[in-house]
Amino acid sequence: MKKLLLGILGLGLLLAGCQEPVEPVVQKAAGPKLVSCDPTDGTQGLTGSELTVKMTFDQNIKCPSDKQALISIDGGASIGNVNAYMTDLTIKVFGLEGGGSYVLTVPAGAVQGYRPNQEGSEEVKFTFSMKKVEPYVPSDLDPVKTLVNPKASKEARNVYSFLLEQSGKKTLSGVQSSHSHKNDFIDAVYQHTGKHPALAGYDFLFLQFSPTPAGWSWVQNYNDISAPKEQWAANGLVNYMWHWNVPNSKADWDNGVNNYNFDGYNFYCDKTSFDIREALMEGTWQHDFIMKDIEEVAGYLQLLEDENIPVIWRPLHEAAGNYNLYGPNGAWFWWGRHGAEPCKQLWKLLYDQLVNVYGLDNLIWVWTVDVTAGAEDQYLDWYPGDEYVDIVGVDIYAPDTEAKTRQYQALVDMTKGKKLVTVSECGNIPDPSKCMAAGNKWSWFMVWPNADSNGNILLTPSDNNFNLNTYAYWKQVMSDPYVINREDMPSLK
């Protein structure tokens, strides 16, 4: 029996030794896992016709070209480019339309890792939608018929009514004086063309110096209003602006007050650290300073009102749009350095003080935008509001005399056509006939003074911003049938 059992055992061992070995089961490594997506899944309100989607995985990945061809998007859009680098899969999508909803699909296995015996990725579906964009419809110019100040003087109302009447028919000629209290540019244009510009511009640039001490050869005295009186008496219109000089520090202010030294004053951002935000806060020296300056300007404007002279008033110019376009300080002038909101607050403060506190009813308020490329996108953000602005203007310095349709339409669109529009400053004069032919209903143009190093007015060309204002072109413009000169103006008294 014992021998039999041993035999059976031996036979079993023999049979077992003849069987094939069993291969061990090896599990595949997990495929790459999606960690994040930019934009995030479900994002709404995207803009543009193209989109770059970046999918980030938990490991370095690859996406072979045959797998890239399987990535798809619906809704009529198309896949433009697929790129796998390190942990990121970048997909560029084209042909997106406003208001559309889309699903971008990366099929299972399209994204692969670099580990041996590894699964591909799971299917990824990325959904997003585009902002519905209403078709652009340009606004038509249909200005309101009244000034924002309900107590506006009779003369101011007369001027505004005249501008309304001429809108789309003719444009007024205008020049900026190179001095605060002289009609030097007007006289130079007249001497050459035989016609006076209808609009004369003056500037409170030298407010701190006024009045200069007796005996100075350089005289600044805003109490002398003989130039605007002469202009108004001859049926011309009067425009004032304000390059608002401010002190860099309280010490600079004190130095100006005590020693008549204004070396520490400026209006350019890169030359003063004066902070508009501090100026809007009561209790700061900056606030005390601007309130004193406003009071002083109000006194000079009152002299004009006492003579029944209406003033086209254009302060805080060129703030709109240039806060991110000029220099390391972020603005051209200090009133635009810290963005739109403080600037709008300052405009409203200035309006309240001059109209409601000092009772100036002779002002027609002009808000000026900047023409720097790309600035149009910012216009509305900076606009103080219809209740504080009568007319909107743009300062244009261009190496041509073509109609400025882009700038014109941007201004009209900003107020939905509710405000008159003007070329509030220019170098080369936009050709009035070309402007009218293009449908640009500019109320006036204001040529900036082109002067030599001694301050003498030049009608001859200088740099590219003025070089087309030749003697011949001045005569052409001042004789243009679409231009109103001072000789053509009615009495608006």
Ranges and model annotations:
Residues 175-176, 314-316, 347-377, 419-428:
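Aromatic-lined carbohydrate-recognition surfaces of secreted/lumenal glycan-active proteins
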Residues 202, 379-401, 448:
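Aromatic- and acid-rich polysaccharide-binding/catalytic face
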